Amino acid sequence: MATNESVSIFSSASLAVEYVDSLLPENPLQEPFKNAWNYMLNNYTKFQIATWGSLIVHEALYFSFCLPGFLFQFIPYMKKYKIQKDKPETWENQWKCFKVLLFNHFCIQLPLICGTYYFTEYFNIPYDWERMPRWYFLLARCFGCAVIEDTWHYFMHRLLHHKRIYKYIHKVHHEFQAPFGMEAEYAHPLETLILGTGFFIGIVLLCDHVILLWAWVTIRLLETIDVHSGYDIPLNPLNLIPFYAGSRHHDFHHMNFIGNYASTFTWWDRIFGTDSQYHAYYEKKKKFEKKTE
């Protein structure tokens, strides 16, 4: 009975979304995107698309999303949004981070990306435009990937903080007590593999088109660079997402080294009480600010 009710609710919700979608004006970018997509399919092999296409998407998005935070350090007005104001970025740290990123991206992540083609072939994942999912199904699957990744990240991240293994792996990521956007993927190679597994679990379970790979990469990079940005920007649209952790939540993890282990959402930290020091810190800070007003 419960299963039938769940299916009925899902079907009703799906029909409602489809109805709303039918009322929306036609997307003027759809035709150019369709032409570009078909051009790609006609001029490149699936291996080239899945491997080199995925690498280009990752690198272009990663450094594009890092750019605003990088520029903020040169804009005096933005300093008031810096979370740890006493720890500005340094050229030395950023250059060190950039070099490690290049190694991780091309020596660790690229071999993993090469497996994307074989994954799509084994599971018969389509590439063609005709079978590309509607935007609402794509968003729903990306949300599912985010929930899965966040769950994996919370427990594996917490494990990496265990006193017996922290200094061997996760300590690398904590070299910079005040994070900055480019540091999001600054990590020990083993950590890249361990925490990165959470990214792929959702893909294996939910992928129904190669576009999901790139959509999920886009959302995951946007989120992880945002929480590592070191800035709490007002009117950040990501903060509209229910239970979204945000930059202040993860910045405290880097400052305190303990607690706030989740990557995207706040529920696991809330359930296991690993956000208690975070809330106590900001309550104390609010009281102090009121006294000094």
Swiss-Prot record:
Question: How does this chain sit within the bilayer?
Answer: Multi-pass membrane protein
Q: What is its EC number?
A: 1.14.18.9
Q: In which pathway does it act?
A: Steroid biosynthesis; zymosterol biosynthesis; zymosterol from lanosterol: step 3/6; Steroid biosynthesis; cholesterol biosynthesis
Cofactor(s) annotated in UniProt: Fe cation
Query: Would you tell me the Gene Ontology cellular component terms?
Result: endoplasmic reticulum membrane
- Report the Pfam families cross-referenced here: FA_hydroxylase
Note whether Lipid metabolism occurs among the keywords: yes
At which positions is motif Histidine box-3? 249-255
Protein function = Catalyzes the three-step monooxygenation required for the demethylation of 4,4-dimethyl and 4alpha-methylsterols, which can be subsequently metabolized to cholesterol.
Q: What is known of its domains?
A: The histidine box domains may contain the active site and/or be involved in metal ion binding.
Q: What is this protein called?
A: Methylsterol monooxygenase 1
**Species in which this protein is naturally found:** Macaca fascicularis (Crab-eating macaque)
The gene for this chain is MSMO1
